[in-house]
Regions:
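Residue patterns forming the tRNA-binding/recognition surfaces of aminoacyl-tRNA synthetases
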Residues: 1-52, 64, 72, 116-118, ...
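Short active-site loop/helix that positions an aromatic residue
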Residues: 49-62, 68, 83-91, 165-173, ...
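Acidic, turn-prone loop/beta-hairpin segments
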Residues: 2-22, 29, 498-528, 559-587
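Conserved oxyanion/phosphate-binding beta-strand-loop segments in alpha/beta enzyme cores
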Residues: 101-145, 232-255, 343-371
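A short secondary-structure junction motif
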Residues: 359, 363-367, 425, 458-459, ...
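Protease-associated
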Residues: 63-154, 163
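Alpha-helical recognition segments enriched in aromatics with Gly/Pro capping
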Residues: 172-183, 288-290, 307-308, 313-465
């Protein structure tokens, strides 16, 4: 599972997807000595710290591999498609200009032909543990996950670190060697005891170089997952975890997603839809103290029970007080139940739930459903509309959909507006460390909440990233809010002078001037347009209707009707002007 050594807990695939960073670090191309032959497999890895746990190599069974005599004097096995890229750096500039070749091909074969070919273990500690387990290792395996895009076409296998490695390990019944503890430190069996895995990388490279088993250590730029909590690099680490088998309801997830009105549609069919098409089982357990305790009790005999309510807990514990216990650690951990299989005490497993599971339970958990408020829940579920940022396709949008599908087999929401992230005025991600983050409270104090809201309504479609610019906020404030305010101030000024009370009059449409009728027609069109746009979740389009109407009201109606407000007395034409403008403002 993806695992954070700093936090001491596994992460779900959804959490991992939120924390990828582009990193540039040294990889390793290693010489593995072929058993009984003066030749070496050139194998590549981006995680040198896993090499002490190596138990196999892997090739693609369908690709072509070659045995070559290289200009450095060594004989190598590697993929034909990558040989030039890997071996050409052995040539000097002069050799290249002279047309010399970096290697001579001795043999050609398919990857399948190399299967079970043995090599000498890279580290004695791995061989010792493999022997203790009575399992055979240190030979070439085959799997189509090996690609010809990077490296040598041969990868090293450590089943304890990585899903692909683990699959190969199971397929070939390889030894299980895990020389890293749960703190992310290499263990005492290795020459790198106590080192944090990333700190061990250069030491492993140094060690292999000293033994003449390091062919090269090229820098490799790639996306690497980091913990969303602490920002530390994750490792893929074999350990037990509790899962929800989402793969079993994949078709239901996809079908339910297709009933949702996604805005934009491309998120639902693309980013989120693709996520569901490739859904993995959800690792829901966390090795942490704080959180919702996993409601599973386990006996030493292997029997397990999942408790579904306080009443069930009290019944199986044989203690009525258990129904009132605080359902968090450490209190819940003290409650034991009798094992129906052997009669011994069963204890709660130590893990807590992924916090995203809590978020996905929100629609029913907030009402304590199904224990009470059944009618309230059924009236509100599914939600007519929700909105969150685009990263929540792997977060809240997913957890809601997963739990709703498992419990009710329908989508938990009908309409979703996906929001783009707010960036700085140069289009860069806001960061305190970069000094480009805008304090929202300072912005509210400077520009006002309504001006900021209006900026976000009108800047672009909701799903497009927004560049937050104080200048643009002020421009929108001046053009729209300032105009609206000035129109309101104009009305209040003359209404106070004339002591005009709109509640004492009614619009008499047959007595209205052409200008009055024009403004009311514009008003009705704006109301209809805004209502239609908001009903279809078209926010910028709705704002445009408002913006155009305020411009018509101020720069056309008021400017061309001012003399009617200035007139003496309270003639019908003046009343009509007041009532028309009043109606427009309050609507």
């Amino acid at each position: 599972v993806p695992y954070c050594p700093r936090c001491g807990t596994p992460l779900s695939a959804q959490e991992v997807a939120q924390g990828y960073k582009l990193v540039k670090e040294k990889s390793a191309v290693v010489r593995f000595k072929v058993a009984g032959e003066d030749a070496y497999f050139l194998a590549w890895t981006t995680t040198p710290w896993t090499l002490p746990s190596n138990v196999a190599l892997c090739v693609n069974p369908n690709d072509t591999y070659i045995k070559v005599k290289a200009v450095d004097g060594y004989t190598y096995y590697l993929a034909e498609a990558l040989a030039d890229k890997v071996l050409s750096p052995l040539l000097s500039k002069e050799d290249k200009e002279a047309g010399k070749k970096a290697y001579e091909v001795l043999e050609t074969c398919k990857g399948k032909d190399l299967e079970y070919k043995e090599y000498e273990p890279l580290y004695a500690c791995a061989k010792e543990l493999a022997d203790k387990q009575g399992k055979k290792g240190f030979f070439v395996t085959c799997d189509t996950y090996v690609t010809m895009s990077d490296g040598t076409g041969i990868v090293h296998i450590a089943p304890a670190f990585g899903e692909d490695d683990a699959n190969v390990g199971r397929n070939y019944d390889l030894p299980f060697v895990q020389f890293v503890n749960d703190k992310g430190e290499l263990t005492a069996e290795t020459p790198f005891a106590g080192m944090w895995v990333k700190d061990a990388d250069p030491e492993v490279l140094k060690d292999l170089s000293g033994r003449k088993q390091l062919f090269d250590a090229p820098k490799f730029e790639h996306e690497y997952p980091h913990c969303w909590r602490c920002d530390k690099p994750l490792i893929y680490y074999a350990r037990e975890s509790w899962y929800i088998k989402e793969t079993a309801v994949k078709d239901d997830l996809i079908r339910n997603n297709n009933t949702v009105n996604w805005i934009p549609e491309s998120i639902g069919s693309g980013r989120f839809g693709n996520w569901l098409e490739n859904i993995q089982d959800w690792a829901i357990s966390r090795n942490r103290y704080w959180g919702t305790p996993l409601n599973i009790w386990e006996c030493a005999c292997g029997h397990r029970e999942c408790i579904g309510s306080r009443a069930e807990l009290a019944e199986k514990a044989g203690d009525p007080k258990a129904a009132e216990v605080e359902l968090h650690r450490p209190y819940i951990d003290a409650v034991t139940i009798k094992c129906p299989e052997c009669g011994k005490d069963m204890h709660r497993v130590p893990e807590v739930l992924d916090c995203w599971f809590d978020s996905g339970a929100m629609p029913f958990a907030q009402h304590h459903y199904p224990f009470e408020n059944k009618e309230v829940f059924e009236q509100q579920f599914p939600a007519k509309f929700i909105s969150e940022a685009v990263d929540q396709t792997r977060g809240w949008f997913h957890s809601l959909m997963a739990e709703s599908t498992l419990l009710f087999n329908k989508a938990p929401y009908e309409n979703v507006i996906v929001l783009g992230h707010v960036q700085d005025e140069n289009g860069q991600k806001m960061s305190k460390s970069k000094g480009n983050a805008v304090d929202p409270f300072d912005a509210l104090q400077t520009y006002g909440a309504d001006a900021i809201r209006w900026y976000f309504y009108t800047a672009s479609a909701p799903w497009i990233p927004k560049r937050f610019s104080g200048k643009l906020v002020l421009e929108g404030q001046r053009k729209f809010m300032g105009t609206l305010w000035n129109t309101y101030a104009f009305f209040v000024l003359y209404a106070n002078i004339d002591q005009f009370d709109a509640t004492k009059y009614k619009l008499e449409y047959d007595k209205l001037s052409v200008m009055d009728r024009w403004l009311l027609s514009k008003l009705n069109s704006a109301v209809a347009g805004v209502d239609d746009c908001l009903s279809n979740y078209k926010i910028p389009e709705a704002a445009k209707y408002l913006q155009e109407f305020v411009d018509d009201m101020s720069n056309w109606y008021v400017r061309r009707s001012r003399e009617r407000f200035w007139a003496k007395g309270m003639e019908q034409d003046k009343i009509n002007a007041y009532m028309t403008l009043y109606t427009a403002l309050v609507t």
